Structures are given as structure tokens and as C-alpha cells.
Amino acid sequence: MKKILSVLTVSAMAVSMLAACGNSGSTATTTKAAEDAKETTAAADKAMAETKAAVEAMSGDFSDKKVGICIYQFSDNFMTLFRTELESYLVSKGFKKENIKVMDGANDQATQTNQIQNFITDKVDVLIVNPVNSSSAATITDMVQAAGIPLVYINREPDQDEEKRWEDNKWNVCYVGCDARQSGTFQGEIIRDIGMDKLDMNGNGKVDYIMIKGDPENIDAQYRTEYSVKALQDKGMEVNKLDEQVGNWDQATAQSLVANALAKNGKDIEVVFCNNDSMALGALQAIQAAGRTVGKDIYLVGVDALSEACQNVLAGTQTGTVFNDFLTQSHSAGDAAINYLAGKENEHYIKCDYVKVTAENAKDILALLK
């Protein structure tokens, strides 16, 4: 509103100066006044155009707004659901599909950084970024802030120091996502609720497990790894880590890692924790190939609640998963972008909640995914 008032003031000045031209008795004075008035009028026209854009944003007209979206890797099953829903939501809010550009970072930060620079050069109105590496957030933020473009991070949370920097500088930067500690805790609770009498199949008084991690630099992977086990320990259960490997969120990689772990540790493995469902699907392939049966002589949990994983939970071939609510997250990310375009502020951390998924509610979650 302040911007609109200032533009009206500039316009009034232009009119006054034009009137002054007509009242001058000096040709030189008249010429100079006319030139000044011309410059002022041009400035007013430019400001009025900017104001029109601001008013359109405030009234919900986003048809000419350009949105740049950077996804860390298109082949990630969860991020495919996320980006598809995000695009659809933005279109439903009045953005033109041709003005929404989505780029595949191919799991390479240098590639993604170049894509962000290209979006800046193209003068997009807002950027939504799912970083390849959360540790690169400071560099990304500095690039985008220097260009004066609002920035919404999704799915992969930058560290607390970076988020504090946004707040301290009052930048138009925010993060939309879930607290990965909650997802890890929910994984642990799903296993904990089975009970020690069923979990401790080898009778050593401990929960013997292997951990298949995502990207080791990713904060979500770190928290899920830590808090899934912590949920057991907090209830007095002793744990024994037999193996921990990096699966990089990939199904085929996880299948190979779990196959090797099963060959090495045999029946001693009682629980397989996976940082996401893609890796849990790979783990299940290895478990079945080894002649083991989920729910009978081994337990398996993931995160994301992919459709196939939920079907496996219903069938009893996956113990449980955690719904990474891409619907709420993608809509919240779209709303955050809209707020920035309308000249409004966002909280720097927009939190969404995870949901535990077991056989009791997997059917309900599947219904949401259709």
C-alpha cells in the first residue's frame, strides 16, 4: 500500500510540472521544465506499471508471473509426487502452466546452481528450490537475494544458522517442510509397538538392526537415522546396530546393500530401517530373495508412504511407513510463493506434520494418493 501511495505522489508531481510548463514566460525555462516533466512522467509511468503488477498480485492475478522450480532429482519417487502436485496447485491458483518451469538437478549441485542462475537471468518472479545439498543453501540464498527474488526452500531443510540469517536480515526466504526428527521417531514407534517379545527373535535381549541411509549430508537422513533408534532407547529397549550403509535414496542400491547385509548377518537381523520408501522397496526385494518373511522373522520400515509401500503395508510385506505429506507441503509451498508475490511475509519455517502409517490406516493414506 505504501508503494501505491508513493506512485500516486509521483504521478501528481508529473501533472504539476506539466502545468508549470504552461505558466512560464521564458522559452528556456519552458524547455527545461518540459524535459523535467517528461522524465518525471516516464518515472511515473514506470512506477505505475510496477504498482499495477503489485495490485494484480494482491488481487490474485498471477497469469503473467514466472515461477522457477528446482528439484534435486526427477527420478526420486517422492519428489515426483511433490512437483506434480505443486505444478497443479499453482495452475489452480491462476498461474499459466507455460510460466512454471521445473528443472531436474540430476542430483548434482553444480548443475542445480547453474539452473538457479539461469532462472535469475530469466527474471523469474519467485524461486522454489529443493536443494541437492542442504549445505549449499547459503550460496543459493545469497545468489537469489542479490537478484531480489523471493525464495522458498522445500523438502530439504537448511541448517538452523542459515534460517536464522534469513530472519535476522528480514529476507523473503522461507522453508516449507516437515521436521525429519518426527519421521524418525514415528519409524521407531512403529517398531517399538511390536513389542520386545516379538522383536527379540534371537533371544539376546536387544533389537538387532541394520540402517539404510539416504544422502549422508542431508539433514532428513541424519535425523531419521538418529531418531528412529532413539525412540526405542527412550522406552528402555536395548539396540544393536549390525550394519549401516548409504543407499542414497535409491531402490536398486538399497537392494544390493540389504542383500549383502543379510548374507553377512543372516538371521541375526531383526529390523531393517530405511530412510525412505524407495530404499524400503529395494530392501524388501532382498529380504524376499533371502527367503525371509516380513512380519514373521524380520521387520521393515520406511518413510514417504509411496503408493507401492502402502500397498505392501496392507499386504503385510512392509511393517510400516511414515506419510511424508506432499499434498500439504506442496500446497504450503505454493501459498508461500503467492504471499511473497502479493507483498506479504511468511514465517521463515512453515511446518507440516508426518503421519504414522500401519495396516490400520494404510488404506486411508492410499485414498489420499489417488
Please identify what each model-predicted range represents.
Residues 1-11:
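Positively charged n-region of N-terminal signal peptides that target proteins for export
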Residues 14-18:
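Bacterial Sec-type N-terminal signal peptides, specifically the leucine/valine-rich hydrophobic h-region
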